[in-house]
Amino acid sequence: MLGTPRLLALAEAACIASLEPHLDPGMTSVGTRVALEHRRASPVGAEIEVEAELTELAGRKLVFAFIARHVGPSAAGYAPDQDEELVAGAGSVERIVVDRDKFLARAALRPSRPVPEPPGVP
């Protein structure tokens, strides 16, 4: 099954891929906010295609809308008017454009802290 974290990773990858060719050298983007609706189960081996569209640009802030659909064999048997049945997930991703070196330098200065285990995890 396609888990929600993997669906989010695919969505972020689509946003990054659409943005990267437009960034100046030395610049990158970092995620700041995500809204994700996981709408449909996707069996192992299902082909998923994610489309991302820039919907807002405000200074360094970019907001993308994305939709993840079943394609290929996992979409077989659905008529064109059944598009909603093929949607595995949809949502939005907000990213901020940053200078890569400055961002990494600031991150390296932050003290690292252990991440606490969630309750019930041995």
Residue ranges and their predicted role:
Residues P43-V44, T55-P122:
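HotDog/MaoC-like acyl-thioester-processing domains
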Residues I16-E49:
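Hydrophobic beta-strand-centered segment that forms part of the acyl-chain substrate-binding groove
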